[in-house]
A protein has these predicted regions:
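Structural signature of the thiamine diphosphate
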Residues: 14-18, 59-96, 116-168, 189-192, ...
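Glycine-rich, anion-gripping cofactor-binding loops and their flanking helix/strand elements
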Residues: 39, 55-59, 71, 205-292, ...
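Glycine-rich, acidic loop regions that bind phosphate or pyrophosphate groups
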Residues: 95-134, 232-336, 462, 471
Length: 474
């Protein structure tokens, strides 16, 4: 009979093409077995980089990836990007060694409790049903859009699986029934949009994942709406002349002023966090806010009407209701040339009086110099707005911001690895800071090894800039 590790590797290879990780005592047999499959293993220097790379891979190409690490210290090293993936709703499978079935050793920790503390589920493999448990981990990650830890006890990794006659029936995922759209709510939303003088459609990453860009563009044309996106939805509306760019701190004052004028706002697949909402000042309090989301618990306090459903289905239903409504609102006619992103905040001088570079000027020049077929990977830090604000983003999966959900820094190089593997023919534009870059410098080598063509931009303010600005005046 095949070993537990061989069954896990073979089963996983049917669903996952790329695995990122660091080999250790707890996952060596799994990685050895993985070599016999079609799955490709990309090594990184730190366990945190393994999870961050798998996270960025999904964001860049939409396909499930896996990360792997050993038990104990290897597992504790990956907790921060695991927490990030949970909060950002990124599906991935993390295959880790764990304490043997015979009991905890001095160097073991309660990995299930640690994973649970950051919101990740753990499935522990046994000899009886290694295949079914691996299938379940993959299905759970996909259905919940969350990371799932698949733990392999140290003393069974090399052991043979149980005889198939003794194994339980393979686990099969139940397809969740799709609730029908509420016709009355669709009618109410359509009526509000039809009666709007200044309609705005604000879309996020959820709209991109649902592939709703086209139908939302049609809906915007139906009602004469301007459009905008969250940071993670940047590029959804392409080069539409009516797109205001990113809502929130990465947008211009002019575009924010136009968004504040909206009297009806349709929010699609965006969580409306405090940054998108400009800390409460983005929208007029009198505006009617309609929200589309698959999660009935996602309702934001400013939402007047929540439409629960797939963004494409709801968008199409609204388009059908508004098929005869083709009047262009005066708002579009008077909006003129819509400012995009931070482009109106031009850096007039390349080199300032203190001999330092103006980042506005630098990023504008980089935008002109770099190929448009790009994936922009943005590390966390005080400089976080320059690349999204000044570099053109072709589509939402071309801006990778691993770390924003948990407010981390130092995941840039690792995220670049995942983006490079997911989009090997594109130019990877990695923006990091001196603080975050030095924090994760070991995985610069991983990034170089994985990338065919790429540019690393280090925004160096000689310190942790966010803290200098936040506390320097206090």
């Amino acid at each position: 009979m095949p070993s537990v590790s061989a069954v896990i590797a073979t089963t996983l290879s049917a669903h996952v093409h790329d695995v990122f990780g660091v080999m250790g005592n707890g996952n060596a047999y799994f990685l050895d077995a993985l070599e016999t499959t079609s799955t490709v293993f990309t090594p990184v220097r730190h366990e945190a980089a393994a999870v961050a790379a798998a996270d960025a891979y999904f964001r860049a190409c939409g396909r499930l990836a896996a990360a792997t690490a050993t038990y104990g210290a290897g597992f504790t090293n990956l907790i921060t990007p695991l927490a990030e993936a949970v909060r950002a709703r990124i599906p991935l499978v993390v295959i880790v060694g764990s304490a043997p079935e015979s009991g905890m050793r001095d160097w073991d920790v309660d990995q299930t409790a640690l994973a649970s503390a950051v919101g990740a589920a753990t499935i522990t493999v046994d000899r009886m049903d290694a295949q079914g448990q691996t299938e379940r981990a993959v299905a759970l990650a996909r259905s919940t859009r969350m990371p799932v830890v698949l733990a392999v006890p140290y003393d069974i990794g090399r052991a043979s699986v149980a005889d198939p006659d003794d194994a339980p029936t393979s686990w099969v995922a139940d397809d969740a029934p799709t609730a029908p759209l509420d016709a009355d709510e669709i009618a109410a939303a359509a009526a509000a949009l039809a009666g709007a003088a200044r309609p705005l459609i604000l879309a996020g990453r959820g709209a991109w994942l649902a592939q709703a860009g086209e139908v939302l563009g049609e809906l915007a044309d139906c009602v004469g709406a301007l459009t905008a996106t969250s940071a993670l939805g940047a590029g959804l509306f392409g080069d539409s002349p009516w797109n205001l760019g990113i809502a929130g701190g990465f947008g211009s004052h002019e575009s924010a002023a136009l968004m504040h004028e909206a009297d009806v706002v349709l929010v699609v697949g965006a969580r409306l966090n405090q940054f998108t909402m400009r800390f409460g000042s983005l929208l007029d309090p009198a505006a009617t806010v309609i929200q589309i989301d698959t999660d009935p618990e996602s309702r934001h306090p400013v939402t007047d009407l929540l439409l629960v459903g797939d963004a494409v289905d709801v968008g199409r239903a609204l388009c059908d209701r508004l098929a005869e409504h083709r009047a262009i609102t005066p708002w579009r006619a008077t909006a003129g040339e819509v400012p995009h992103g931070l482009s109106s905040m031009v850096g007039e001088v390349a080199v300032l009086e203190d001999a330092r570079l103006d980042p506005r000027n630098v990023f504008q020049r980089l935008d002109r110099a770099l190929p448009l077929d790009r994936v922009v990977v943005q590390d966390g830090g005080h400089f976080i707005g320059w690349a999204p604000g000044y570099l053109r983003i072709p589509a939402p999966n071309r801006l990778i911001m691993v770390g924003t959900a948990l407010q981390t820094i130092g995941l840039g190089f690792a995220s670049g690895v995942g983006a490079a593997v997911a989009a090997p023919d594109s130019t990877i534009v990695l923006a990091t800071g001196d603080g975050g870059g030095l924090m994760a410098l070991s995985d610069l080598q991983s990034f170089i090894a994985a990338t065919r063509r790429g540019v690393v931009i280090v925004v160096n303010d000689a310190g942790y800039g966010a803290e200098m600005h936040q506390y320097g005046s206090k």
